[in-house]
Amino acid sequence: MDVTGIDAAKAGWVAVSIKDGQFSWTVASSLDEIECGTRTYIDMPVGLEENKRRSVDRLLREELKPGRTSCVFNAPLRTALEQPDYHTANDYSKQHAGFGLSKQAWYLLPKIEQVRTHYQPGWVESHPEVCFARLTGHPARHSKRTVEGVAERIALLQRYACPAYWELNVRGVATDDWIDACLLAIAATLPAVYVPADCPVDITGFPLYAALPKKITFTETV
């Protein structure tokens, strides 16, 4: 199976693909410029709720306890895509869903809208930090934006013979963007589980679930 992992970046999007065991990469300003694999994991909310928190966000945070839960933010309501400004969207979310809209989620709305506009069968939301936790047996011990955090993530990627794309100097793509895209691509090659397990969809038919690799136990090797 040919697979792709996609992460958002200042340049737009960074994609790492694996086909017949060979890695390749693409940096594009728009998702429609990326030739995606049959299975594509993307680090971005896809399905959005109308008036409540997404169950998938809660379940992903559970995977990162005790110290890395802040890596998963609450996705915005679908109606946030229609709001003219942050304050209006934030007030609407508080009134109709009981929680505010983070600035992080607000600034990602154009990316979320792009995912929903260009969505293809085989695309599914995933989360690189949770993929890391499942492939190592524990959440990362350090932030991916620290020297120590980069090192522990690279150590995992090297177990899968991943090329050192994070050493490339591509404008608008940070080291952690490369690492996240690589983690997602590798995760997509492995047997998948879905959270929530019943694979719900939102009112517009987009998936309200994430794909993750099956947990590797201490007796398994790569």
Predicted regions and their residues:
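Phosphate- and other anionic-substrate recognition elements at nucleic-acid/protein interfaces
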Residues: M1-T4, A8-V222
